[in-house]
């Protein structure tokens, strides 16, 4: 009783077709396809802008005068 037979699925599909009609379902599927295409195009545009962007610059670590290293903490300066 918990599983649906083929006749249940046929009735469900018939009701959906009656409610939405053939034109609305095809319009809906067209909108979904257009959304997927625009999403893929957006992903490709992001990859192109990432390639065109400037390379990442690294910051050189230099110690400032008066700064002590962590290993020098507690030792006496000579």
From Swiss-Prot:
Keyword Cell inner membrane part of the UniProt annotation: yes
CC terms in the record's Gene Ontology section: TAT protein transport complex
Ranges annotated as biased composition (Basic and acidic residues): 43-60
GO BP terms, alphabetized: protein transport by the Tat complex
Compartments reported by the entry: Cell inner membrane
Cited InterPro entries: TatA/B/E, TatA/E
Topology term for the membrane: Single-pass membrane protein
Coiled coil, from the record: none
Polar residues: bias regions: 61-72
Keyword annotations from UniProtKB, A to Z: Cell inner membrane, Cell membrane, Membrane, Protein transport, Translocation, Transmembrane, Transmembrane helix, Transport
Membrane spanning stretches: 1-21
Region (Disordered): 43-78
GO molecular function: protein transmembrane transporter activity
Family: Belongs to the TatA/E family.
Function recorded in the entry: Part of the twin-arginine translocation (Tat) system that transports large folded proteins containing a characteristic twin-arginine motif in their signal peptide across membranes. TatA could form the protein-conducting channel of the Tat system.
Stored HAMAP family: TatA_E (MF_00236)
NCBIfam families noted in UniProt: PRK00720.1 (NF001940), tatAE (TIGR01411)
Assembly and binders: The Tat system comprises two distinct complexes: a TatABC complex, containing multiple copies of TatA, TatB and TatC subunits, and a separate TatA complex, containing only TatA subunits. Substrates initially bind to the TatABC complex, which probably triggers association of the separate TatA complex to form the active translocon.
Protein name: Sec-independent protein translocase protein TatA
